[in-house]
Amino acid sequence: MSDLFEDPAPSRNTPEFTVSELSGAVKRVIEGEFGLVRVRGEIGRVSRPASGHLYFDLKDDRAVMAAICWKGQAGRLSVRPEEGMEVVATGRMTTFPGQSKYQIIVEDMAPAGAGALMAMLEKRRAALAAEGLFDAARKHPLPFLPRVIGVVTSPSGAVIRDILHRLRDRFPSHVLIWPVAVQGEKCAPEVAAAIRGFNALPEGGPIPRPDLLIVARGGGSLEDLWGFNEEIVVRAAAESRIPLISAVGHETDTTLIDHAADRRAPTPTAAAEMAVPVRLELLAGLDGQVARLSRCAAETIRRRDQRLRDLARALPRLESLVAGPSQRFDLWSGRLSGALGQSVAARRARLEPLGAHLRPRLLADLVARQKDRLGDRTRSLETCLGRRAERARDRFDALSARLAPAFARLIAETERATRRDAATLGTLAARLDAAPEARLARLSDRLEALDRLRQTLGYRETLKRGYAVVRADGAVLTTKAEAGAAAMLEIEFQDGRLSVGRGKTRKPKEEPPAQGSLL
């Protein structure tokens, strides 16, 4: 019975290992048997320590495997590992003897199918929308007529050719192309750098700053367009101070940059159509506005002129206004002559008695006294004026000393302004002199073109090709009946005219009777 509870003695032929030796042997077997493998599973328990390495689990409904992605490789992963995401990890199997567990060193990672990509895309879209990156309040209006357009796309391919062709057809503009990769690992960082690079250009620098940006790419699968779903691209588009049009893929393709852009275009060609209007339509609209303005101005002038005529007819005639005052003037002028004579006679009669009382001596004394008083006043006034003039001269000298620098600056500024105005006037004069000559040249070219068209469409060019014009009594004949009724015909050829008299009408030759049938 005791044998049932005792372990059998180990065989002396079984090899003996230390723990380290056995762990190393297991490590060599696993690394040799499972070199490079691809493992599909759900990510769980993601850890990102300060070292930069990435630790997580790959699991399914029956097993869990530890996974490691070193710092240098973690930054190059196309997918950012998140808990709950289903992925396919590519890497090499190994063991960690310190904890007696096996694990996979991940070198690459991709979502497990389109469903996983769509789930990750929706989760990322919701997170970015919660931050307000897709709010309508952040959108910028597109400029009506941008001078410079920046295009972020691949420099080769049909996309850039379609955009340039459409811009050239609608309204030629200055286009700056920032070449980027439009798929793959380099796509997202290069597109984000291009958007930020255009925004960093200074106003008035050697490279003109665009007024509008177009981010464009042709159609493709969800994986091909994934670079435009990356968070770095979406944030760069949302932060752009320059209005941005997203034209990624076809009309059915939707990426996250479409939500962050100020406007989404279904195709790159449509983006070019959104960017600029049609130049010919603008010119036609401008011509229509000018024509309407001219008609409105002419109608306004006509109505004002008619109103003036109506008011003029309502006013009284000038002769009727002047007739009454003129008659009164004649009446009063006759009366005034007699009244003046009577007034002079009455005043002379009053002055004659007074003149007898006036003596020359009294007048001379009065004049002498007034002259002495005037001399005293003059001397006093001269003294006072001298003192006031001296004080005024002192104040004037002080003010002159204070105002001299200001006058000097004013004179200098006036001279500079005069030189600038003279330069501006010279430029305007040159432009004014050149404008009539340019207009005269354009009108001359148009006149020559119309003259060539007149010569081409004239009937004399037709005569050179063998035709002739038939006239009778100065009128052109167009039918056989008119020619038969005319007595004299005049035929015009290329080199002159020929008169032809009507000859004797020949009787048409009768056709022989048809031979009857012998049967």
Curated annotation (Swiss-Prot):
Main location: cytoplasm
Recorded GO CC terms: cytoplasm; exodeoxyribonuclease VII complex
Localization per record: Cytoplasm
Entry EC number(s): 3.1.11.6
Protein's UniProt keywords contain Nucleotide-binding: no
Catalysed transformations (reactions): Exonucleolytic cleavage in either 5'- to 3'- or 3'- to 5'-direction to yield nucleoside 5'-phosphates
Listed GO biological process terms: DNA catabolic process
Molecular function as annotated in GO: exodeoxyribonuclease VII activity; nucleic acid binding
UniProtKB keywords: Cytoplasm, Exonuclease, Hydrolase, Nuclease
Region annotation Disordered: where it falls in the sequence: 500-519
NCBIfam families attached to this UniProt entry: xseA
Known function: Bidirectionally degrades single-stranded DNA into large acid-insoluble oligonucleotides, which are then degraded further into small acid-soluble oligonucleotides.
Assembly information from the UniProt record: Heterooligomer composed of large and small subunits.
Family that this chain belongs to: Belongs to the XseA family.
Name under which the protein is recorded: Exodeoxyribonuclease 7 large subunit
Organism placement in taxonomy: Bacteria, Pseudomonadati, Pseudomonadota, Alphaproteobacteria, Rhodobacterales
